[in-house]
Amino acid sequence: MSLRMILRILGLLLMMFSLTMVPPILISLLFADGMWQAFVVALGITVGTGALMYLPNRHARKELRTRDGFLIAALFWSVLGLFGSLPLMLTGAAALSPTDAVFESFSGLTTTGATVITGIDLLPEAILYYRQQLQWLGGMGIVVLAVAILPTLGVGGMALYRTEIPGPLKDSKLTPRITETAKALWYIYATLTVTCALAYMAAGMNWFDALGHSFSTVAIGGFSTHDASIGYFDSAAIELICSAFLLISAFSFSLHFVAWRERRLTHYFQDPEARFLMLFLAGLIIITSVSLWLTSDYETLQGLRHAVFEVVSIATTAGFSVADFSTWPGALPFLLFVAAFVGGCSGSTGGGMKVIRIILILKQGMREVMRLIHPSAVIAVKIGKVSVPDGIAQAVWGFFSAYVLLFFLMLVGVMATGVDQVTAWSTVGATLNNLGPALGEASAHYGDLPSLAKWILVVAMLLGRLEIFTVVVLFTPAFWRK
C-alpha cells in the first residue's frame, strides 16, 4: 500500500475542495449576511491541511493497487465530510455543536438530506447556499464513483450491471479512460442542473431558491432552503418539475450518456432497471392515490398530486416533501418508507439497495420456488435474454446479507442510546438508504437525537453511499496484510 501516494491524492482533493468555499463567500458578500469570515477561515484551514499532505509527497509516483482504491474511496468521503463541517461550526449562525455540524455535512455530501437544523428559513443565505452546494458536489462525486471508479474495484451496482446485464452498455465502457468518463458525466450532470434551475425559475421560484433546489434535486439530496421544503411554494408546476428531474436523476447516468451520444431515448425503455423503476413507481402512485382518496380528506386531484410527488420523492430517496407522509392513514407511511430500500438505478445519484439488486433477488427467489416444483430442472436467472452467472447471484446475496447484518447492528446501537424502536428503525433505514426523512421522533428533524446515535447514523450514511463493501473491506485483516 502506497501511503505517500494516498496522502498526495487526499491532499490534492482537499485543496480542490477548499475552492468550493469561494461561492458561499461571494453569496455572503452579495447578501451582506456577515458569514464570509467563517468561510475564509474554513478555506484557509482546508487548503493548508491539503498542502501539508500534498507538498511533501508531490513527487510520489507509484501504481495504485485495488486495495489503495478502496481506502481512497472511503477516505475521500470521510475527510471531505469532516472538513465540510468547518463552516457550519465556525459561523455560529445555526448554533451547531461539532457533532451536529459533522452530521449535517455528511448528510449533505452523501445526499442523505437528514437535518439537525430547525428554523432553516431564518438562516443566512451563505449557509443556505452551502448546504445545497454540499449535496450537489456529493451527487457529482457519487456519479463518478458509481460509474467510473467502483466498477474498477469490482464492487457496486454498476460492476454487476456493466459486466453481465444486457442493454446498451453491454461489453463497453462509456469512454476508454476514467478521466474522460468523469468529464462526460460531469457535463451531463451540469446540464441537468442548469436545465432544472431554469425550469424552477420559469415556474415561479426566485433565482436563489431555483439554484439551491436544482442542486439538491439533481443530486437526489432533499435539502431545501425552507423548513416546509417544496411544500413552501404550494405550486403544482414546481412539484411536477421536481418529480420529473428526480426521476431522470434516478436513472443511470450511463443511460443519459448513451441517450446524449446517440440522440435517442429508446434506451430508457430497453433497460431492465429503468423499466422496473418506472413500473414500480407507477404501481406505488396508484396504491397511494387510491388509499388517500378512500381514507383521507384530500380531493381526488389533490390526493393524486400529493401521491405522485411523495412517491417519487421518497422512492428515489430524495426526501423532499409537500405533506407530512408520516401522518397519512393506514400502512402508507410504512409502504413509502420501505420503497426507499429499493432506491434508484445503479450509476444514479439515488440511494437504497439499487434496483438491479432487487431485480436479481426477486428472480433468484422465483428460481428457488421453481426448483421446489422441478427439483431436477436447470433454471437460469435471466435479465432480458442473458443468463446471470452464479457468481453474480452470490455477490448480490452477499451484499444483502451484509446490509441486513449492518442494519441490525446499527439499529441495536441507536436503540441502546435511548431512542425508541420506531425512531431507531426509521432513522437507520433513512440514513443507510440515504433517504433523509424518518418516522417517529425524527419525522421533523434529527436534532433531538443523542450525540452517539448521530455518530452511528453518520456511519450509516457513509456505508450506504459507498455501497457497504467499500467500507467493510477496510476492517478485514486480509486487507492490511502485505
Swiss-Prot record:
Location(s), subcellular: Cell inner membrane
Superkingdom of origin: Bacteria
One Gene Ontology term of the molecular function aspect: potassium:chloride symporter activity
Record's keyword terms, sorted: Cell inner membrane, Cell membrane, Ion transport, Membrane, Potassium, Potassium transport, Transmembrane, Transmembrane helix, Transport
Topology of this chain in the membrane: Multi-pass membrane protein
Keyword set includes Ion transport: yes
InterPro entries associated with the record: Cat_transpt (IPR003445), TrkH (IPR004772)
Transmembrane stretches, start-end: 9-29, 35-55, 70-90, 136-156, 185-205, 240-260, 276-296, 325-345, 395-415, 455-475
One GO cellular component term noted in the UniProt record for this chain: plasma membrane
Keyword Transport found: yes
Function: Low-affinity potassium transport system. Probably interacts with Trk system potassium uptake protein TrkA.
Cross-referenced NCBIfam families: 2a38
Family to which the UniProt record says this protein belongs: Belongs to the TrkH potassium transport family.
Name under which the protein is recorded: Trk system potassium uptake protein TrkH
Species of provenance: Halomonas elongata (strain ATCC 33173 / DSM 2581 / NBRC 15536 / NCIMB 2198 / 1H9)
Gene behind the chain: trkH
